[in-house]
A protein has these predicted regions:
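Short loop->beta-strand "edge-of-pocket" segments that line small-molecule binding or catalytic clefts
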Residues: 32-38, 133-147
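Ligand-binding clefts/hinges and TM-proximal coupling segments of bilobed small-molecule sensing domains
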Residues: 15, 19, 151-165, 202-204, ...
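Short helix-initiation/N-cap motifs at beta->coil->alpha
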Residues: 21, 74-85, 128, 145-148, ...
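A ligand-binding cleft/hinge motif common to bilobed small-molecule-binding domains
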Residues: 85, 99-107, 154, 176-177, ...
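Extended ligand-binding regions for polar small-molecule ligands
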Residues: 2-4, 59-68, 147, 212-254
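Flexible hinge/capping segments at coil-to-helix
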Residues: 27, 124-141
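Periplasmic-binding protein-like
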Residues: 116-124, 191-232, 252-270
Length: 270
């Protein structure tokens, strides 16, 4: 049987060997397990709780994918910079790690239909709040390697000094330790973090374009991609991602965000 809720025990998958050919849908079904790459340290989207179980918005979705495929799910922890490589090396079948769709990434992987909307945000200590990008002049901004925040600031604000980390947990610890003046990543994530860390505030709540978050598969894995798209459309009929939000995000955000500003149903962005 497969897990039907967000309480999936943390585990790691082994690489499928030296071949770079992605597993087909039939091969995944026959194996009885789908390998899904998720974050282990990006609460409330993908994280490991104190019982060693994977939790979060992406994980709730991943559990449903496995259930509807009729397989178990094997979670593989990824960091932002490793997401593409884990697909191309077949360490995972699908990435569900808060993966923002960009033109550059779409050259390397195939994105399915989106299930979430997002922009960038900037969090900083309340006593030295960064509320405008101009406030970052002469300051150090913490970002994750391989993230849209890194790309955005390098392209649009090259004079801003960036301090980069592989892991989100490292990045936030750097902010707590005062190694940087602010941190930028998805606004959905910094809003959640600031609510749980007294003395910090999101001074810039929406920066850059409104982007979408989507599952990704290895380039050319059309069969799995088509199945994912059909699944996302089908889930839209039951308002699945509204339920996902209410289960995993609403307990964190409360009334500070509007559900429909974040959630995408049936792959259709409104």
């Amino acid at each position: 049987c497969s897990n039907s809720d967000a309480d999936s025990t943390a585990s790691s998958a082994s690489s499928s060997g030296n071949t770079a050919k992605a597993r087909t849908l039939d091969e995944i079904k026959k194996s009885g397990t789908i390998r899904i790459g998720v974050f282990a340290d990006k609460k409330p989207f993908g994280y490991v709780d104190d019982k060693g179980a994977y939790q979060g918005y992406d994980v709730y979705f991943a559990n449903r994918l496995a259930k509807d495929l009729g397989v178990d799910v094997d979670y593989v922890a990824v960091d932002p910079a490793s997401r593409v490589e884990y697909l191309t090396s077949t360490k995972v079948d699908v990435i569900l790690a808060n993966f923002t769709v960009t033109d550059e990434r779409a050259k390397q992987v195939d994105f399915a239909l989106p299930y979430m909307k997002v922009a960038l945000g900037v969090v900083s200590p309340s006593q030295n709040l960064i509320s405008l990008v101009d406030d970052l002049k002469g300051k150090t901004l913490i970002v994750g390697k391989g993230t849209t925040a890194e790309t955005y600031f390098e392209e649009h604000y090259p004079d801003v000094k960036l301090l980069k980390y592989d892991q989100y947990s490292e990045a936030y610890q750097a902010l707590l330790d005062g190694r940087g003046d602010a941190l930028s990543t998805d606004n959905t994530e910094v809003l959640a973090w600031a609510l749980e860390n007294k003395g910090y505030q999101v001074g810039i709540t929406s920066l850059g374009d409104i982007d979408t978050i989507a599952p990704a598969v290895q380039k050319g894995n059309t069969e799995l991609l088509n199945w994912l798209n059909d699944e996302i459309k089908s889930l839209g009929n039951e308002q699945f991602f509204h339920k996902d939000y209410q289960k995993t995000l609403e307990p964190v955000y409360g009334q500070t965000t509007n559900l429909d500003d974040l959630v995408v149903e049936g792959g259709v962005v409104n």
